[in-house]
Amino acid sequence: MKFTKEDARRRVLNCAKQYQQKLLNKKLIIIYRERQDNAIRYIEVVFHERNYQHLTGLELVDEEGNVLRNQSMNFYRKCIENKLGLEEFRFKQDGTTQLKLAALPVLMDITKITKITGDYNNVRPYLFVDKVMGGVNFCLGLSREDNVYVPSSALLEDIKRLTDAPSQVLAILEKGIDTEVYSTVKHVAKGLNLNNITLPQEINAMINLDNYVYRGK
């Protein structure tokens, strides 16, 4: 499917509400087993208002068609308030917008989809990210900001093509951006009981498994 501007507008307005409901101001801890040395490590991913525009592949423009920079918060609020006009945006000229729009709805279920994470291998000319997470049909590119990662690009692509060392995700937990401890378990690898695995002390200090119940295979 090739998106028209009307299609794009409809999709980004709809997905903005889903983003607000499912991901906005949430923080995820991705606990994984490093493929190269078998060590258990983690990354944290946070979702802000300002990250949403990057995921759409759209650019805000002025009345003369000039791209407006540093308007990501404005873009998101226009989407939430259904105030994004067709003349207010354009598709990026590098051709990535169609790919991003196709992947955007899938992103909202990122915690259900993610089975693998790894360092990005720079195989795509227009994808500038540090890490990737996802599965066989979807990949979320992550950019590092200080000690956490933020979402910057989503693609309908097998993650194993985008990382040279795909590492198994053991668990994903979620918390509010201002909450101290991760206590909501969103995903656990099939057959894994988190109560029976020895996690590094650093990770143990960040999570609370009091409400976790092993569901079996």
Specify the residue positions occupied by each region the protein language model found.
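Compact beta-sheet-dominated globular domain cores
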Residues: 135-190
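An acidic, glycine-rich, mixed-charge low-complexity segment common to nucleic-acid enzymes
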Residues: 1-126, 130, 174-217
